[in-house]
Amino acid sequence: MNKYEMFFKVQNDYQPSPYVQVVKRLDPGMYKVTYDDMTDSVTFKVMESNHDELVDLPETEYDAVVSDVDLFLRPETEAKFKEMGFIHKFNILLHGPPGTGKTCLVNRVAQKLIAANAIVLFNPQPYALQKTYEILDAIQPDTRILVIFEEMDEHVRREETALLHVLDGEVQKKNAMYIATSNYIEKIPARVRRPGRFSSVI
């Protein structure tokens, strides 16, 4: 059995592949999510972070993102969101030409959140997140989530409606942070990257 694959059974009459392990809870870490609409099931495949890609980054950019992460992790922040009637979540958009350190920065943030017992979902299809969130809410509702959308412009091109439902529509998740990256921010319509949708655009 592949130890890097885990499967949550969501239908009693469906038997998972013998190569997939059934688990009751996800450990902190980074996962690739696959949704099977025929069986209405979600598979989480463990990914390993690439520490070799961590390089020096402009301190102002790194500090700005880490400041948002630290704010997100504070219990008083969650309490304040709840008091105001808002869902506790943060959305960050990182942009710039290839080679400017976006991936390295995302890796650092992912490691910081994993160390705080979070689950990281790497580049999921937006339409698959509704079922993913239903499962996570059922088994570990208070776990913090980091969702990474690489090449945000491509997600917008293929699944804009589903993406917007996730970011601030019908498919929202409490205790979730979203980090989207793009090499070509001009390809993302202004309505998608408006300030009210992203707390930080860096």
What do these predicted regions represent?
Residues 1-76, 82-84, 88-89, 94-99, ...:
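AAA+ P-loop ATPase mechanoenzymes
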Residues 76-84, 165-177, 188-191:
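Conserved Walker
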Residues 90, 145-146, 177:
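The start of beta-strands in P-loop NTPase/AAA+ ATPase cores
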Residues 102:
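Conserved lysine of the Walker
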Residues 108, 143-172, 187-189:
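Conserved AAA+/SF3 P-loop NTPase catalytic/coupling segment centered on the Walker-B
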Residues 114-143, 160-161:
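Short glycine-rich substrate-engagement loop in P-loop NTPases that contacts/grips substrate
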Residues 149-150, 176-183:
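Structural recognition of the conserved hydrophobic beta-strand(s) that form the central parallel beta-sheet
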Residues 190-202:
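A short helix-turn-beta junction within AAA+ P-loop NTPase domains corresponding to the substrate/partner-engaging
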